[in-house]
Amino acid sequence: MVLLTMIARVADGLPLAASMQEDEQSGRDLQQYQSQAKQLFRKLNEQSPTRCTLEAGAMTFHYIIEQGVCYLVLCEAAFPKKLAFAYLEDLHSEFDEQHGKKVPTVSRPYSFIEFDTFIQKTKKLYIDSRARRNLGSINTELQDVQRIMVANIEEVLQRGEALSALDSKANNLSSLSKKYRQDAKYLNMRSTYAKLAAVAVFFIMLIVYVRFWWL
């Protein structure tokens, strides 16, 4: 289930639009998650990963960044990641068309609160079970969600560093992993060459032995 949707400007974390599931409908207090979302917005910058999943216990945040705007959704952890990102892509397409040019000029929080109407309509589409089955088949062109960075929301917020730093560490780990694989391949090649050289030396010595002692 989609429980919370927020849109914010990356440059300063200013909330532009939001839609929250009513507490009595969801049976959960979403204020804590809304607070975490606002903290996250303040940590984003131009170097932050443009696609990210943040685990929050039984819930999961997903976000995308497009044209300097962050589109974030809070879902139950069991909600399919592919659908969550397809939902965010739909919001981006409509929001950018309606308000994209105005985003850099606004200074008041929730200047586009009327966008909630479209959010609610789109959310119902993704929650409906039959629609979800259809969406699951038509969104095959969505980027590989398995490659999207995954982190823990509490660790990101408590670490006190920008999300870009976390992304940098992930890239460093990827580089180290690649270097390790290259080094391992090089060592395997050296080992193979050493074995071949040993075999060659054996046969040369055998030929020399036969030639000088038996001929």
Swiss-Prot record:
The chain crosses the membrane at residues 195-215. Residues 6-119 form the Longin domain. Interacts with STX17. Component of two distinct SNARE complexes consisting of STX5, GOSR2/BOS1, BET1 and SEC22B or STX18, USE1L, BNIP1/SEC20L and SEC22B. YKT6 can probably replace SEC22B as subunit of either complex. Interacts with the COPII Sec23/24 complex composed of SEC23A and SEC24A; recruits SEC22B into COPII-coated vesicles to allow its transport from the endoplasmic reticulum to the Golgi. Interacts with BET1. Residues 134-194 form the v-SNARE coiled-coil homology domain. The modification Phosphoserine is found at residues 137, 164, 168, 174, 177. This is Vesicle-trafficking protein SEC22b. It is a single-pass type IV membrane protein. The modification Phosphothreonine is found at residue 140. GO terms for cellular component: COPI-coated vesicle; endoplasmic reticulum membrane; endoplasmic reticulum-Golgi intermediate compartment membrane; ER to Golgi transport vesicle membrane; Golgi membrane; melanosome; SNARE complex; synaptic vesicle. GO terms for biological process: endoplasmic reticulum to Golgi vesicle-mediated transport; negative regulation of autophagosome assembly; positive regulation of protein catabolic process; protein transport; retrograde vesicle-mediated transport, Golgi to endoplasmic reticulum; vesicle-mediated transport. Residues 1-194 are cytoplasmic. PANTHER family: VESICLE-TRAFFICKING PROTEIN SEC22B. The modification N6-acetyllysine is found at residue 38.
